Structure formats: structure tokens, C-alpha cells
């Protein structure tokens, strides 16, 4: 089967425990969903040169990943990276190279620290909930100073009630 023009691939919930080494046949792949499988690692050759500019969305949630292959940081157009509910104990240094990353989720892992270059990211959405982060781990996360005030949950609830009246 020739898949050279494939843009989106969803192999979620298939009990996949290993991936093939050769992903060179998917040069136009922009979205890869491998959630709810049994992956414990990713092939070192998975993020090939042909995919480095096309892949924008990766969902590896609900697997058994213990480490993240640093080759993922060569994906220059990666915008969404979902790693929720794995067994990750760290995020490798180099994540700051993902200059187009806007959504990063890694809830429900075993993360204790964040890499020093984490503060280079310009995220719109970040979820690190349910991790045993050390007290000093989130120091790389600096609040956005763009003049935007985020309302409290109480204020949002009050607005919702007011709008329903």
C-alpha cells in the first residue's frame, strides 16, 4: 500500500506494543495519533528527515513510555504534543527547540523536574497535572506578561450566571 500522500494517521486503541523502524514512506504526515496503545518506546528512526517539516500533531497519550526520544525535537513544525498518562520520569533537554509548539500535555506521569530550556516554549496550553513535580520544578514557567488578565474561576462562574439571566 502506498501512503506517500497521507496527512493524518490514527492508530489509537489498537494494543500496539512496537512500531516499525521505517517511517520514510510518510513524508506528508501532519497528524499522528498513537494514543491508548502499549508503546514503551519509540524507534530512534521514527522522526526522519522527511517528516521533520510535515508533522505538526502527535498524540502518544495512554501508553507506557518511560522516556521520550530526543529526535522528536527535530520536528520543526510540531504544534501539539500529547504525552498524558505514560510513565515518563523526565522530559529530555532540548524541548526548547520546538519553537512552534503551542500545546504540551503530560499529565499523569512521574515527572519530577522540567528541563532548563522549557522556558523557551511559547505555549498556549500546558497541562502537567498529576505529576510529582518537585517544589522548584516549575520555576521555568514564567507567567505571560502581555497585559491580559485571566479572570478567576469565581469571576468566570459569575459571568456565566449573569449571561444566563
Where are these regions (language model features)?
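The feature encodes a structural signal of leucine-rich repeats
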Residues: 1, 19-22, 42-47, 65-71, ...
Amino acid at each position: 500500500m502506498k501512503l506517500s500522500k497521507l496527512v493524518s494517521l490514527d492508530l489509537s486503541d489498537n494494543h500496539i506494543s512496537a512500531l516499525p523502524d521505517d517511517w520514510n514512506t510518510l513524508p506528508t504526515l501532519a497528524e499522528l495519533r498513537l494514543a491508548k496503545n502499549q508503546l514503551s518506546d519509540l524507534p530512534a528512526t521514527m522522526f526522519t528527515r522527511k517528516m521533520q517539516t510535515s508533522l505538526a500533531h502527535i498524540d502518544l497519550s495512554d501508553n507506557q513510555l518511560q522516556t521520550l526520544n530526543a529526535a522528536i525535537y527535530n520536528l520543526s513544525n510540531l504544534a501539539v504534543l500529547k504525552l498524558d498518562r505514560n510513565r515518563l520520569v523526565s522530559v529530555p533537554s532540548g524541548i526548547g527547540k520546538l519553537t512552534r509548539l503551542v500545546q504540551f500535555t503530560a499529565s499523569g506521569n512521574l515527572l519530577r523536574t522540567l528541563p532548563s530550556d522549557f522556558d523557551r516554549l511559547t505555549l498556549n496550553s500546558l497541562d502537567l497535572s498529576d505529576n510529582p513535580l518537585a517544589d522548584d520544578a516549575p520555576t521555568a514557567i514564567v507567567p505571560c506578561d502581555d497585559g491580559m488578565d485571566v479572570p478567576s474561576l469565581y469571576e468566570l462562574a459569575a459571568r456565566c450566571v449573569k449571561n444566563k439571566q
